[in-house]
Amino acid sequence: MKAIRSLKTLALALTVIAFTTACQSDDDNKNPANKPGYSDYKVRMTDAPGNFTEVNIHIQQIRVHSDVDGWVDLTTNTGVYNLLDFANGIDTLVASDSIPSGRVSQIRFILGDSNSVVVDGMEHPLTVPSGSQSGLKLQVHHDLIPNITYEVLVDFDAAQSIVLTGNGKYILKPV
């Protein structure tokens, strides 16, 4: 039950951030990959500062759910990201692609097994119970207009999202 509640909290928090979408017309963007009936969709990531030395998440894939094509895998910059590298106004592009215009209802971060947290110089595995199989889910509900570039900024709050359990394990419960 706690996992469902934390997932709903994550979705609500990140939905608010996701709606801070920046849009540009194709004239401003000059992206040759943009095709008629398609929109460019970019996912960026940032973090609020926390009390950890490192918070590493292993991004394997970012996908969006489109009412036109169902699940679409975005071209993803895979790898292990230290969330603390992206604080204080710094962000990074983690996925980008041209997708069919229409409604995007959800973004999923598919994470690998190399998630970790460094505390007092010691690296500990970081478990992601709510998204270990299907990914961290973000409800967004964006209506995409053709030839517009959309950017979604996902702001992880590592300080509030990492929990030390009673048995000494660290889990990621995004808020």
Residue ranges and their predicted role:
Residues 24-175:
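A short, solvent-exposed, low-complexity linear motif enriched for acidic/polar residues
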Residues 2-11:
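Bacterial N-terminal signal peptides that target proteins for export
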